[in-house]
Amino acid sequence: MAFFRRLILMIQFLTRIPIKYESDITTEDFGKALALVPIVGLIIGGIMGVTYMLLVKVFFYKISAVLVLIEYIFLTGGIHLDGLGDTFDGVFSNRPKERILEIMRDSRVGTNAVLAVISVIILNYVILTEIDPAYMVKVIILFPVAGRLGSIVSASLSTYARRGEGMGKSFIDYCTLKELAIGIILYAVIFLSVGLSRGYIIMIFPILTAVILIKYFTRKIGGATGDILGAVCELNQTFYLMTVYAVLYFRG
């Protein structure tokens, strides 16, 4: 079935989880499959949540938090962090659009990339350690779900910025508002099923932040790329943690 073929495609492409499965894949499958990435986020988050529960039996919760974040990088291969770095190198170079796109494709790592990646990782760690441990497992499970929603929003609300082909083109060209609707439904079902306190409020903000982020990036370069989809994913996760902290803090 197309559903399982596309889900496996996303697991293979976006994670290091070893799944040996081969089938005929089209460029359209990549864009259509993007609707299913909240499920991929749930798989990643589920692994992280179980790992955290085991780690806190041995280590202090702050050590457990940093180890879980390292596990996240390992599970994803840093693919979205790479996109974050490339995006910041290009967008904040203060160059014309075409030069920005060239910088984003350059394999060399610039100062903006290093600062962006380090800042996001530190922010994620600091916020996690400030969250009430009673909520930690649920917060961790939903962390990659909120992030991957950002990729769907970004792809469905933008056009491809480069001339010619690129990996991001398949996602952006074929991820339509239909995929966005499916993705948001899956995202909402997962969010509410996990049962995080005030989850119905918290789940709205990653949608809004993703829209704001993609509008900003597309205004800078006239569209989006695969790197930008990854950048929005990572930034969305950090803004999600900020939202969780704020909502739980003011809840008292």
UniProtKB/Swiss-Prot annotation:
- Classify the source by domain of life: Bacteria
What pathway is this protein a component of? Cofactor biosynthesis; adenosylcobalamin biosynthesis; adenosylcobalamin from cob(II)yrinate a,c-diamide: step 7/7
Q: What is its EC number?
A: 2.7.8.26
Q: Name one GO biological process term.
A: cobalamin biosynthetic process
What reaction is this protein's catalytic activity? alpha-ribazole + adenosylcob(III)inamide-GDP = adenosylcob(III)alamin + GMP + H(+); alpha-ribazole 5'-phosphate + adenosylcob(III)inamide-GDP = adenosylcob(III)alamin 5'-phosphate + GMP + H(+)
Which pairs are disulfide-linked?
none
Cofactor(s) listed? Mg(2+)
Single GO cellular component term:
plasma membrane
Q: How does it sit in the membrane?
A: Multi-pass membrane protein
Q: What is its main location?
A: membrane
Q: Which Pfam families match?
A: CobS (PF02654)
Q: Which InterPro entries match?
A: CobS
Q: What enzyme category does the UniProt record give?
A: transferase
Spans traversing the lipid bilayer: 36-56, 59-79, 109-129, 133-153, 170-192, 199-218, 228-248
Transcription regulation: present as a keyword of the record? no
Which GO-annotated molecular functions does the record name? Answer: adenosylcobinamide-GDP ribazoletransferase activity; cobalamin 5'-phosphate synthase activity
Keywords, A to Z?
Cell membrane, Cobalamin biosynthesis, Magnesium, Membrane, Transferase, Transmembrane, Transmembrane helix
- Asked if the keyword Membrane belongs to this entry, the reply reads yes
- What is its subcellular localisation? Cell membrane
User: Into which family does the record put it?
Assistant: Belongs to the CobS family.
PANTHER family for this protein = ADENOSYLCOBINAMIDE-GDP RIBAZOLETRANSFERASE
Task: Tell me which HAMAP family the record gives.
Answer: CobS
Q: What does this protein do?
A: Joins adenosylcobinamide-GDP and alpha-ribazole to generate adenosylcobalamin (Ado-cobalamin). Also synthesizes adenosylcobalamin 5'-phosphate from adenosylcobinamide-GDP and alpha-ribazole 5'-phosphate.
Name-wise, this protein is Adenosylcobinamide-GDP ribazoletransferase
Q: Per the UniProt entry, what species is this protein from, by scientific name?
A: Clostridium acetobutylicum (strain ATCC 824 / DSM 792 / JCM 1419 / IAM 19013 / LMG 5710 / NBRC 13948 / NRRL B-527 / VKM B-1787 / 2291 / W)
Name the gene behind this protein.
cobS
